[in-house]
Design a protein with these regions (language model features):
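Catalytic cores of eukaryotic secretory-pathway lumenal/extracellular enzymes that build
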Residues: 13, 83, 108-110, 130-132, ...
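Predominantly a Rossmann-like dinucleotide-binding segment in NAD(P)-dependent oxidoreductases
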Residues: 129-277, 407
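C-terminal helical cap and adjacent loop that interface with cofactors, partners, or active-site loops
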Residues: 49, 286-412
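Hydrophobic residues in well-ordered beta-strands that form the structural core
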Residues: 98, 104, 123-125, 328
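N-terminal Rossmann-like dinucleotide-binding module
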Residues: 1-51
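Rossmann-fold dehydrogenase core element
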Residues: 111-128, 148-152
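Beta-loop-alpha module in the N-terminal Rossmann-like domain of NAD(P)-dependent dehydrogenases
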Residues: 12, 51-115
Length: 412
């Protein structure tokens, strides 16, 4: 197979995760250019992938103004900056890997899917959960008829109290206007899993949820704007930024603060940047818990719960069928099949393949990249998370958010 060349647009945390595939499999993928507004990120990528300075750009516009210089574009910008570079890259002839969500606009999602079809290019959306051994095992059991006809599904997404504070209170995805609603940004993964496991079109959605806790009303008396401003609650507050970001851990989430991982560099970032703010005094507006109920074309029903208020960060799934049930916990990487005609359940303990150790989402990041590279190598063969497939889950998310706000059932 030929080596695929790629440009990286957006060199933040997600962009660097996907680009890592080129480090570990240089015979398959090579990063040849980068675009990012932050100079330190550009320098890091150039150093890591031996990219000349002339191939580093301050913006995607400057990069894509050049003639096509690679086979593919990895587009990992923030949510509200997905559509324009994706359409421009497709127009230039690039195959595209696009971080989810496709867009924070329903019409733009449809436009992206249509553009990919017209351009006859691979456009893979980063619905990484489809690629995990965990969910692939569940899908295989369902397709093999082990539990008969699927009747219902329920999934819980435990975001984790500190993860929610990091990403959705202080971080890039805290504000639905600047980013996306929580159901779209975080939980389009889960809607995609429902669609994939059901194999049917969703026809009806209802949803409830709100921002309950991370707001000014819950700020302790006398708490300052920043954790670094002498907060009297530092010792007792689980969200104290100094405890979270000034420990010995310099990986995620600490590496989101700055590229300077010295204690002084991190403290400076907390004093000046968004991650040092009090969690009760931010400009966040996304929900901190939400439930969604769905009905599919074949009558299958599904329920989903997302909550910030957990100690663990994992998904749990239950699939009930006419001949048995599947219960699964991503935290323990265990899938349990209990057929009604068998006295004892079958316990499937999944191992994490060693090649996925440097990736997230239960190995999904690694297998997504492998699938994308192979699709490009094969000149555009269909992949597991194409834009046309991913569009369905995005439409469910937009409907769920309308239902939550308008307090009514939405027909799709």
């Amino acid at each position: 197979m030929k080596q695929v060349t790629a440009i990286l647009i957006g060199a933040g945390a997600r962009g660097q995760v996907y680009a890592r595939y080129a480090q570990e499999h240089p015979e398959e993928l090579r990063i040849v250019a980068v675009a990012d507004p932050k100079a330190d990120r550009r320098e890091l990528v150039c150093h890591t992938y031996d990219i000349p300075d002339a191939q580093a750009f301050e913006s995607w516009e400057k990069l894509l103004a050049r003639p096509q210089m690679a086979d593919a574009a990895l587009i990992c910008t923030l949510d509200d900056m997905h559509t324009e570079p994706t359409l421009a890259a497709l127009n230039r002839g690039y195959h595209v890997l696009l971080e989810k969500p496709m867009s924070n606009s329903e019409e733009e999602c449809k436009a992206i899917a249509a553009a990919a079809s017209q351009a006859q290019r691979v456009l893979s959306i980063c619905h990484v959960l489809r690629y995990t051994p965990f969910y692939r095992t569940i899908k295989r059991l369902i397709d093999d008829g082990e539990i008969g006809e699927v009747a219902s599904l329920s999934q819980i997404e435990n975001v984790g109290y500190w993860h929610h504070a990091h990403s959705f209170v202080r971080g890039n995805w805290r504000n639905s206007e600047k980013s996306s609603p929580m159901i779209l940004q975080k939980s389009c993964h889960d809607m995609d899993i429902f669609v994939w496991l059901c194999g049917q079109r969703c026809v009806r959605v209802s949803s409830f949820g709100s921002l309950q806790y991370f707001n000014e009303a819950h700020a302790p008396k006398g708490a300052p704007e920043r954790c670094t401003d002498g907060c009297p609650y530092n010792e007792s507050c689980p969200y104290d930024a100094k405890k979270i970001y000034l420990s010995d851990n310099v990986g995620w989430p600490t590496d989101m603060l700055t590229t300077d991982m010295s204690l002084e560099g991190r403290l400076k970032a907390l004093k000046e940047g968004p991650y040092g703010r009090c969690v009760y005094r931010c400009d966040n507006d996304v929900v901190d818990r939400q439930v969604v109920d769905l009905e599919f074309e074949n009558g299958v029903v599904a329920s989903f719960t997302m909550t910030a208020f957990t100690t663990d960060m994992a998904r749990q799934l239950k699939v009930c069928g006419t001949k048995g049930q599947i219960t699964a916990d991503m935290n323990t990487n265990t899938v349990i099949l209990h057929r009604f005609d068998e006295a004892s359940p079958r316990i499937i303990e999944l191992e994490t393949p060693p090649q996925t150790n440097n990736y997230g989402h239960g190995g999904g990041d690694y297998y997504l990249m492998r699938d994308f590279v192979r699709a490009v190598q094969n000149e555009g063969t269909a992949n597991l998370s194409s834009a046309q497939v991913s569009l369905q889950s995005h439409l469910i998310c937009f409907a769920a958010e309308r239902s939550r706000i308008e307090k009514r059932v939405i027909e799709l």
